[in-house]
Amino acid sequence: MASVYIPVQNSEEEVRVVLDQLPRDASDILDILKAEQAPLDLWLIIAREYFKQGKIEQFRQILEEGSSSDIDEYYADVKYERIAILNALGAYYSYLGKTETKNREKEEQFISATRYYNKASRIDMHEPSTWVGKGQLLLAKGEIDNALQAFKIVLDTAPDNVPALLGQASVEFNRGRFSESLQLYKRALQVFPGCPAAVRLGIGLCRYKLGQLDKARQAFDRVLQLDPDNVEALVALGIMDLQANDSIGMRKGMDRMQQAFEIYPYCASALNYLANHFFFTGQHFLVEQLTETALAVTTHGPTKSHSFYNLARSYHSKGDFEKAGMYYMAAIKETNNNPHEFVFPYFGLGQVQLKLGELKGSVFNFEKVLEVYPDNCETLKALGHLYTQLGQNEKALEYMRKATKLDPRDAQAFVGLGELLISSDTGAALDAFKMARTLMKKGGQEVPIEVLNDIGALHFEREEFESALENFKEALGDGIWISFLDEKENLEQTGVSVLGYKDTGIFHRLIESGHSVDVPWNKVTTLFNLARLLEQIHKTEAATFMYRLILFKYPGYIDAYLRLAASAKAQNNLPLAIELVNEALKVDDKNPNALSLLGELELKNDDWVKAKETFRAANDATDGKDSYAILSLGNWNYFAAMRNEKRNPKLEATHLEKAKELYTKVLTQHNSNMYAANGSGIVLAEKGQFDIAKDVFTQVQEAASGSVFLQMPDVWVNLAHVYFAQGNFALTVKMYQNCLRKFFYNTDSQILLYLARTHYEAEQWQECKKTLLRAIHLTPSNYTFRFDLGAVMQKSSSSTLQKKKRTADEVRSTVAEAENAVRVFTQLSAASDLHVHGFDSKKIQTHVQYCSHLLEAAKVHREAAEQEELQNRQRLEVARQAALAEEARRKAEEQRKYQLEKRKQEEELRRLKQEEEKFQRIKEQWKSSTPGSNKRKDRVEDDDGESKPSERRRKKGGKRRKKDKSSRARHYEDDEEEAATMDDHNEVEDEDANTNYNREDEMTTQEAEEPVDDDAHDLLAAAGLEDPDVDDDEVPTSGVRRRRALSSSDEEGELMEESHPNSSPQKEKEESNGEAGDPNMEEEEEEEEAN
């Protein structure tokens, strides 16, 4: 049993104080310590013992008395003990300030601690323990940098000061510098291996933050070896076990948390983890107790944030969104609005705000979550839905598409994407829903009815009725509807019709026969869609049965009443349709759809006043926000303006202006409403503003063409009407024809009537008649078309007879048209129910008389036209015979010219062939001649004496050749004369040719008798000839050169007859050179070659 001894003053006796039996009133001990003037270290020992025993007041009383001014004055020379007492008080108040939850009290405690540390520094400003205390105080106040400076002051003078090392390690840990903190903890342990277990706790926390989980676990286990009741180590190991994500680890983790809670019930971390455990077990009352306790015992921001989060989650799961939101915001506040510290409260708050309709706040918080986890699919899906509700579809699609890319196996993400795409891209929406269905089936999940219904509805809107039917059947499963779909039940025998919609006997009979007529509430919509599909594919009886089945099980299902009313309207049973709509209004007398349909039926029933009141009621039921009701009122005003046959201009203008106002109101609310835009265009067209109306109709047409949900043939018809009013009949016809083909498969008689009117105005009578015949074929009971056909034939006949020039065929056609018109009008006049169709018998008789008159006139015109046609045929026959005779003469003349040309070509070819043969003979003769070298030399020597006479003879021979050439030219000019004369000329030419040939022979003989020297090749070259035996490369390569050689040979033959027989070859060479230099000679040669 530990004791301390207080020495008695002026005596050797001592007062023994047992530390375990300290008095409850510290005043007794203080009296002894003061009376005996006990050493200050005893004061400190006794005060510390009181603190250990939890007697904080006695501890504070003793230390405050030990730091009083009297004590300071009495123990002025005792520095260390006085400093120790002051530092103990500073540490105590630092602890109070750290644990205080109220800011004001916290600040007061820190001020007291600061005062004691400053007083200790005044005693000795270099005391390390004082700086360590100051560092701890600054660390508790959150002044990390100042705390670091305080610890450094100590470590600069005493590097191995363990408290300073531990303080600096704590600072580095709070600064996130876990490696540096770990080194400082290890250094402190090296300096003092026997330090408390808390040092190893710091090492474990550093290693945990650094991701060294195994070494961290070793450190925490060592702490528990040294201190089995260390709560922090138990909590740390419990967290690590829980993070293992397996059943064994989670069980061990919760056991450690429970153990820590039993050791110290005020450990906030243990309380939070226990609360989290009980949240998942559904024990919310324990969650609230534990988190409230944790909040009461901790001031640590992150720990309090976790406590608020647990409390918020508990209220959130119970549906108390107001409290949940409040605690989520408290959790966020404890993290200083930094989502990176603790992001879960942001996600929870976003969910709560979404439930409460605070969409923008929800978006803000989910965006904060994305800052920390940008690839979190749940957050992306939530933001996709939020932006959809805010009307920002582009952003919504962006987030949904990102979610599907990040997790292609998330079926719900594809469902959300499909819901977003329904209004903009049905194909992509259908693909998304199909992908979701595939993923669900692969995952073994049951595909929700809603998904199958959406897939079926999209197929239905795309007119893929078979696929829609399969999906609706899959969504509905087994039921009575299967029997009717497979035609196992005879609908006719069952007695299904719209008329008996109140008769429930059919269903009672089915129940009695063993059939189940149950319709689960979550299948009603799909069953309605199935009935709508059957109605679309003309299985009206089966659809009627489905609607009646829905009403049998759910009498308040208004849409079923409205579809039955639509069926009755299609059968032209307006009273039954009105009765069914009234039944729907009994369920909800302010249903805008029912009121709008009732107004339409009343309008069709020509009950204008009631229709207007009904449309107003539909508009009031939606506070003026229902576009259909406003459009119906606008249509009513338009029809009212057009209804009055007398056309009161003032009333008409009033109704049109009101209609325009209502259409504009709809466009203001929904600027993409094409029906309102179409109505505005109609009003503009009625006012004569055709260009503006045309622009409006064109824009509506383009918008409607880009939508698969919307079919608007009306806008095509209206646009055609505008073209018609502007007189552009070609475009009008094209628009009507396109509308017929695109929307009505060329079977709408009313549009055919519009088309016929256009042809009529364009005076295209035959096209008009064909169009009316098509309309009559489609609706043979419509006598209006027959009357119009008769009028068209009447007009066609009249216009043909009024022509100044017309053929007999046209007149005969006119007679046929007039006869048909008489027949049509006669048939109409014989009908007994003319008044039903709005015809006047007197007016029809007038048409009959007029057509009969046309017929008589047409017959007269026909006879005249036939006579004129006969005369024209006779004139044409005479002209044809004359033309044939002229053609025969022309062909004979062409044949004669052709024969002459052919004969001329043959003669030319024969002449060229003879010249070629002569050339070949001359070549052979020159080759066979043997030249003499001595005679050549003699010729060369005599060249100078014979040059001039030879030149004169050259000129004389040139004139003869010119004369011969002109003779030949005259020969070619006479080719146009008669055949007999041509024969005489040919004989003359043949004689001339023979004469020339004989002269050439004589020249050749004379030349052969003369000796030839070694320069014979040069002579050949001068005459235009070359010896092929001398040099093969010098053979002439063109026909022109050959012809020049022949010409030269002819001239030489003539010259040789006139010259002296002893003339030398040298003179002949000079003469040949003279010919080569004569330009007239060259021209004559060129003319001959051309001919």
From Swiss-Prot:
Function according to Swiss-Prot or TrEMBL: Component of the PAF1 complex (PAF1C) which is involved in histone modifications such as methylation on histone H3 'Lys-4' (H3K4me3). Involved in regulation of flowering time. Required for the expression of the MADS box genes and flowering repressors FLC, AGL27/FLM and AGL31/MAF2. Required for histone H3 trimethylation on 'Lys-4' H3K4me3 at the FLC and AGL27/FLM loci. Involved in the control of seed dormancy and germination.
PROSITE patterns: TPR, TPR_REGION
Organism name: Arabidopsis thaliana (Mouse-ear cress)
Renumbered ranges of TPR repeats: 90-127, 128-161, 163-195, 197-230, 232-267, 305-338, 343-376, 377-410, 412-443, 449-482, 558-591, 593-625, 640-673, 674-707, 713-746, 749-782
Gene Ontology BP annotations: flower development; negative regulation of flower development; positive regulation of DNA-templated transcription; transcription elongation by RNA polymerase II
Deletion phenotype: Early flowering, reduced plant size and defects in floral morphology in whorls 1-3, but fully fertile flowers. Reduced seed dormancy and increased germination rate of freshly harvested seeds.
Protein name, entry field: Protein CTR9 homolog
A Pfam family per the record: TPR_16
GO cellular component, one term: nucleus
Residues bearing PTM N-acetylalanine: A2
Cited SUPFAM superfamilies: TPR-like
Quaternary structure and interacting proteins, as annotated: Component of the nuclear PAF1 complex (PAF1C), which consists of VIP2/ELF7/PAF1, VIP3/SKI8/WDR61, VIP4/LEO1, VIP5/RTF1, VIP6/ELF8/CTR9 and CDC73. Interacts with VIP3 and VIP4.
Tissue expression as described in the entry: Expressed in roots, leaves and shoot apex.
Region (Disordered): 919-1091
